[in-house]
Amino acid sequence: MIDILLAGVGGQGTVLAAKVLAQAAQSKGWQVRTAETIGMAQRGGNVTSHVRMGSNGEAIYSPLITPGTADMVIALEPGEAARALPYLAPGGVLVTATTAIHPVTAALASQPYRAGDVVAALANSLQAEASREQAAESIVAPNTVTADQDASTDGVEGYPVPLFIPVDDEALVREAGAGSRKSLNMMLLAVAVAQGRVPLTVDELKDAVRACVKPQFVTMNLAAINAAVEACG
């Protein structure tokens, strides 16, 4: 069984990303359960989607992922990654965009909301978790997505090591071209798949996009996926 939590801000397409992920899993014959929690505002509020996939033929009875059990958290915004972090299981994978969406309250706060600080705090938190579990000597936390990231999450003495994959989404948007900011959700799914962290192929992800996305937006989303896969090498 694979449990993936997707987190973002209203309007980023978190629910659509969950739908695409579920479609790709269902096309393989897996049982899938999904659920969403949506903030007060349709746009600007936090949105969390739960996707539970029976990748080994398991029956799934509850659509909700409990804290500390998610195999992967995919966040479309670093602040939402921090909010969703308690759901990550030991040895889990955190994939997050590094560009912040500034809430209205940030303008009123004495301390500015800096995406870089949040990303650094996430890395430090996962490093501390690895240390607490007496796992690996250091966490794999590159500044950008690369093709040669260590695929192992086995620490010394068998303790699982969390993996942090911060994604330079601004660079991916430039690579994919105009309009691709709207496809950030598909970019992050593609990164997770291309890194081998989700047992799906890129082609299966693309087929799910064709099945779930409105026809006029398919080409844009496929281009975003291609840009993300190319960035991963």
Predicted regions span which residues?
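Active-site cofactor/cluster-binding pocket
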Residues: 1-233
